[in-house]
Amino acid sequence: MKENIISFFILNIFLLGCSSDNNSSEVDETFTVSGKVVDSDGSGLANISLTIGNQTVYSSASGEWSVSNLKDSVKITPMADGYTFTPASATASSTLTVTFVAEKTAIDLSAEAENIVAWFENVQYSNGLLPSTESSSTMSLYDNALAALVFTATGKYSKAESIFNFFNQRIGSELTTNGGFYQFRSTDGTTSGARWVGDNAWLLIALNNYMAKVETTKYDKLKSTLEIWIRSLQDKDGGLWGGITASNSTISKNTEGMIDAYCAVQGYDDFHKKLLAHLKENRYNSTDGLLVSWPGNYYEYALDNHSWGYCTFEDFPKTVLEKTTMYANTQRATANGALITGFAPDIDKDIVWLEGTGQMVVAYQKAADSYKSTTYLAEMRKLLISSTLYPNSVGLPYASNLGTTYGSSQLWKGADTNICISSSAWYLFGLLNFDPMAVGYSRGTPDVDKFWKD
């Protein structure tokens, strides 16, 4: 009996020792939590913030996230402006994998979009064209191309056709006679300004989008004649002349116009190959990995080359969208006093350029960077203003405040207070998740010609 009691005590001591060792092991043990943030279609969402204990991490480009060496119990909470998540949070005290499904916050975007489109419809003249700003008598080719894209994106095809019809009727009197449509014209039809390759390219981009949705041969001649003129501007070095001035002299080559033309002329042939070769040799800083707007100048870079370059060229690096802090700034809006953060057209950073900020939203959406696209869309929303002429019609001014455009040129009076086409259109494209440069994006560019991948 005594031996049994002694054995019992020895066994208990052994078990207690083992228990103590096990508890010590559990205290020292660490674990990993990981998972993914996806949208309702199961696609990964980038740059979603996740608070995990006292740490903050961000989801990768594919939506994945992971944190290791955790102890005790931690709460995992995803956060992003404009989104709700299911589950709203999760708790882990051991290795755990969890997927958060993000849904856009229930903002009545449809009503907002309808009020923007209503403004476009209200300002359209009987001849089909729209003034560039409310109460303006100036009609811009680029702005009307954007308006045609607005109507196409929202299924208002007859409104888009009214714009195309105007130019279709002037193929002989303008396009084939002078080469290219004029940059500006007044409400009575009087033309002025240069005939820019970029503006004409955007009319072709609008046609490409329309013809991708509507089966018609009505605008085949307009499309082919625009393309022929754009191709005719290619120099022997592969670059494109910027167009023709009002005095019929040649406009120097500009990067933005060459991007526009590359996007507008569909397919891939020697035109595109030579154009890429020119950009590589003359308009690309391989050290910075950026397209150059003005070689050797103080204003070397321009914002739209980041966004349009990314949306136009296949496999263009996402890093170009990250290298835009040189333009980021915050201003107090003239129209309503709101503080708004966005991008300037250049390094002066004296305005928030709403059109350019909208272009960045579209580029961020293409890059699946939902955090930044949602953030800057919300910033732009602060400057939605009501029409002074039409009820239930809203839009955005060109800029937050008066300052300079690209370079040192001053903005016009009213650029910070009057609704304009360009900013309103690009904001709407962001609302609709519509990329006008997506049609024809996959053109089979050979890897050897993609200089940005060198």
Where do the protein language model's features map onto the residues?
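Bacterial Sec-dependent N-terminal signal peptides
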Residues: F8, N12-G35, T99-A111
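A short, solvent-exposed loop/turn motif at the edges and junctions
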Residues: T77-S89
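Hydrophobic beta-strand segments
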Residues: I48-I52, I76
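Alpha-helical support elements that line or immediately flank enzyme active sites
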Residues: A145-Y157, F167, S307, F313, ...
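Structural motif
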Residues: T30-A46
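Extended ligand-binding clefts on enzyme/binding-domain cores
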Residues: I107-Y142, T176-S186, S192-G198, A212, ...
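Short Pro-Gly-centered beta-turn/loop motif in secreted/extracellular proteins
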Residues: E64-K75, D81, S94
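Short, acidic Ser/Thr/Gly-rich low-complexity loop/linker segments typical of extracellular
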Residues: G44, N54-S66
